[in-house]
């Protein structure tokens, strides 16, 4: 295979979409597998919608996922001279023409076609006119003179051969009246200039492919290999939208997913390697190929994503987990060294009940002794309806324990339960709510051992 060069070319008009992140991942893996280059291009020709915040989100999202790009980032907004040069060459060679038709006139043609129930293809009266007929008071656009006869064949690695009749392709605008290039021309000029050998993108771009190939052919450029992958759908099979959940990579990061986990999950959305589910980035680079791509849309499955993330959480060492958990807690709390120590001691018990870093941080609040305890609604109701005298007995009983470890605490609870002819769970329910602020938590006995007598009694006495 020739030196492989792939590209990821997002438009900076919002967050880094989860589907776009998968496209970037596939391009990255294919380039790395073939010892090639993975390039990044920002398609910011839409000045009104493109923002610096969106560009920053793309950069930070890719870096967080570990998808490092080669060479400097290409910004289309800085390359209009390249596009203009290509358009003027086509004009000189008779493969493009100046068009003076207004948008109002085009819209009239469109409406007429609709009224006659005909497929609309714009036919410009300026296609074959001589320069002496050009008006002097109107700024023209430059349109491609698409061949009227013949057909364009898209040789797609995944979709197979897709044939489009030239008669179904309009004379697309290459250069607007203000001298700026359209998306279609910019993409082709950039891909050629950057030496792109393989285009891997969503199949929503398949309709663009034929039009872009028409420009490639007019310019005499070699058409890169094309692979159009099915989009990601929601769990209900519909096209992914906001109602299906978080869409941006930054949102998944904020929800407590690990980048290794998200990459693994996205990789398996539309690509497979036998029955392997857990695939490291090293393995992905070694195994990735276009032959193993699926032809059907993949469905976003949060349960599977959570399960995979839980696996990757358990692969981290205690110090790393503690550091990541504390980092999240510091967004809302001032954390002392003592509290960090408590969280570190408790990490194995917290991990059992967690699928994300956010889950860990939520449970770790139990150990923030220097901050007021936060009670969830269920815990509040349990405390409100509990036997206050029973809690007083528990407080007095725990205060008498000399060696305050989980075995001693558990034995004391059993003793109090027996004395009151109660089940152990009858006591533990309100005690858990008071100590943790939750109706479900890791073992209260283990929590008591870590926090110590003084902190436990302080929480029980708040009733």
From Swiss-Prot:
Where along the sequence does the record place the motif called 'HIGH' region? 10-20
- Indicate which residues form the motif 'KMSKS' region: 239-243
Gene3D superfamilies, from UniProt? 1.10.10.350, HUPs (3.40.50.620)
What sections of the sequence does the record tag as coiled-coil? Answer: none
Q: Which residues bind ATP?
A: 242
List this protein's GO terms for biological process.
Answer: glutamyl-tRNA aminoacylation
Query: InterPro entries recorded for this chain?
Result: aa-tRNA-synth_I_cd-bd (IPR045462), aa-tRNA-synth_I_codon-bd_sub2 (IPR020751), aa_tRNA-synth_I_cd-bd_sf (IPR008925), Glu-tRNA-ligase_bac/mito (IPR004527), Glu/Gln-tRNA-synth (IPR000924), Glu/Gln-tRNA-synth_Ib_cat-dom (IPR020058), GluQ/Sye (IPR049940), GluRS_core (IPR033910)
Enzyme class of the recorded protein, top EC level: ligase
Q: Which UniProt keywords apply?
A: Aminoacyl-tRNA synthetase, ATP-binding, Cytoplasm, Ligase, Nucleotide-binding, Protein biosynthesis
This entry carries the following GO cellular component terms, namely: cytosol
UniProt signal peptide: none
> Where does the protein end up?
Cytoplasm
Which reaction(s) does its UniProt entry say it catalyses?
tRNA(Glu) + L-glutamate + ATP = L-glutamyl-tRNA(Glu) + AMP + diphosphate
Q: What is its EC number?
A: 6.1.1.17
* Role: Catalyzes the attachment of glutamate to tRNA(Glu) in a two-step reaction: glutamate is first activated by ATP to form Glu-AMP and then transferred to the acceptor end of tRNA(Glu).
From the Swiss-Prot or TrEMBL record, give the protein name.
Glutamate--tRNA ligase 2
